[in-house]
């Protein structure tokens, strides 16, 4: 505990907040190239094979990004757009792919939540 004299002389140090998406460098999205596409199992108590990919961003950062939705067409050297947003049950995965942009196709035939998955508007009869 500092004395009152020490508090006056030195003041209080501000707490520094850590940046969770440091690789984006304060940008809303970044472009990247897939290095490897794989699956990973989530933490307890969940069970699945979550699709992830290792991506090298345009600023030379290597990150893991989650591929949302059912099915994908990604492979090595695919160009993708990355946004922030972690996956709660996958440690170390702090980014999401944006579907329907660059080489990652949207989900065909999706009717609900289309904007999140890059799906086209269904034709009305």
Swiss-Prot record:
Pfam families: Ribosom_S12_S23. Keywords: Mitochondrion, Ribonucleoprotein, Ribosomal protein. It is found in: Mitochondrion. Gene3D superfamilies: Nucleic acid-binding proteins. InterPro entries: NA-bd_OB-fold, Ribosomal_uS12, Ribosomal_uS12_bac. Coiled coil: none annotated. One of its GO terms (biological process) is translation. Protein S12 is involved in the translation initiation step. This is Small ribosomal subunit protein uS12m. The lineage of its organism: Eukaryota, Viridiplantae, Streptophyta, Embryophyta, Tracheophyta. The gene is RPS12.
